[in-house]
Amino acid sequence: MSLPEHVERLLGVPVVGWRPVVGGGWSASVRGVAELADGRSVFAKLGDVPGTIEAIRGECAIYPLLSGPFVPELVAADPAVPVLVVEDLSDATWPPPWSPELLAGLERLFAELAATRAPAGLPSLAGRVRQAGAWELVAADRGPLLTTGVVSEGWLDHALPALVEAQAAAPTAGDRLLHFDLRSDNLCFRDGRVLLVDWNLAVAGDPRWDRLFMVHTIQMEGGPNVRELAPDPDPGVLAWIAGFFAARAGMPPPVGAPRVRGFQRAQLAVVLPWAADVLGLSTP
């Protein structure tokens, strides 16, 4: 069954037009905008390869738990396929570029998220951090990181113990809602609201993590420097984020996401020098 056919099945309304969505994001999920016979348009995505299947199935489970001005309307979900259908955001503004107005909107988003209690049923940030791994993965096998050219072996010999120690102190406790995958292709602006998409990694924890995941991508896209956007970062959170990218940037690409490693190398090249500076280490 095709994705438009799944939309018809779930909504009980004929699809009279279909526009595939390509580009953006890092997964190979099937995506598109359906024009419905009742005049509505909706965005739908389907997981059909490893990685996207688990991500969309997870999002189908999490999405009904979510509420807030930053959550697009859920139209339908079928975790068995899996298929997710939400409101169409084609007319929204998707950064970059980053204007002062968009950056101000992003600050409002951070405040909204920090004020939002995570719904019951979300995984914990502490569990997600343990499951994902960061510098401990590099300590077990530093080879992939060294192939990126971002660090030398000598620098890693000197810095790795401090990075492992710092990430162990990262604050994970908390009951706030975290998106945990904030970057420009996962958010848009419309009618004074910031709307977040791709909620499959949402957790309950300390809200400082979302800001630090987001701000380095703004610098990468020509926006302000990370030190302007987060002048007082938590050293442990920053160390863990750098370690997350360090452990993955040199690995083969996962199935269905051929471009993600290049992006992670670019992220590492911004976050690791920042983390090193905050921790008083030499520049990699």
List each model region and its residues.
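Juxta-kinase regulatory segment immediately upstream of eukaryotic protein kinase catalytic domains
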Residues: 1-20
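A short beta-turn/loop motif at secondary-structure boundaries
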Residues: 22-26, 77-80
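Active-site acidic catalytic loop and adjacent metal/ATP-binding pocket
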Residues: 25-36, 43, 164-209
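A conserved alpha-helical element in kinase catalytic cores
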Residues: 40-80, 92-112, 209, 218
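Hydrophobic residues embedded in beta-strands of well-ordered beta-sheets
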Residues: 41, 82-84, 194
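Short pocket-lining segment of the protein kinase catalytic domain that shapes the ATP-binding cleft
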Residues: 84-91
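A cross-family kinase active-site recognition segment
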Residues: 93-155, 173-175, 203-204
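Helix-rich C-terminal or lid/interface subdomains of diverse kinases
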Residues: 204, 212-284
